[in-house]
């Protein structure tokens, strides 16, 4: 399955242009998806801005301390995510993990008042239930 992975608010907390703190459980679940054979493509608004922030995000993801397999692909521009619907994701072999995807579980962002980020623990449970993970 192709998984389009957002960065800010998904892998890390919202802090753009800086890179925010790691979103709890993100790297563990992303690594499990990679090990299961899913193809991860970075899909971020950082691709729309020519300020070096896309390269910074890729460098961050590929840091050896994060334990991920290399993520080298990214969309040329941000693709607006479809809803977090695992039945449809299985049908079409693509999944969007993105804090702006409809129906994706969210938790409060610790750094921005009234902000939210992906709830990776709940996402992981849903992926296991759908036999994606």
Where are these regions (language model features)?
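Alpha-helical substrate-recognition element adjacent to the catalytic core
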Residues: 1-77, 81-85
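C-terminal cap/substrate-recognition subdomain and adjoining C-terminal extension
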Residues: 39, 52-133
């Amino acid at each position: 399955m192709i998984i389009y992975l957002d960065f800010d608010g998904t892998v890390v907390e919202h802090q753009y242009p800086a890179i925010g703190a790691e979103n709890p459980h993100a790297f563990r679940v992303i690594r499990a998806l990679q090990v299961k054979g899913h193809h991860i493509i970075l899909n971020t608004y950082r691709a729309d801005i020519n300020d070096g922030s896309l390269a910074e995000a890729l460098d961050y993801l590929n840091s050896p301390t994060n334990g991920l397999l290399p993520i080298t692909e990214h969309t040329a521009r941000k693709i607006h995510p479809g809803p977090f619907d695992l039945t449809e994701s299985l049908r079409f072999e693509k999944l969007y993990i993105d804090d702006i995807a409809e129906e994706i579980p969210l938790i409060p962002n610790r750094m921005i008042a009234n902000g939210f980020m992906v709830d990776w623990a709940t996402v992981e449970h849903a992926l296991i239930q759908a036999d994606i993970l």
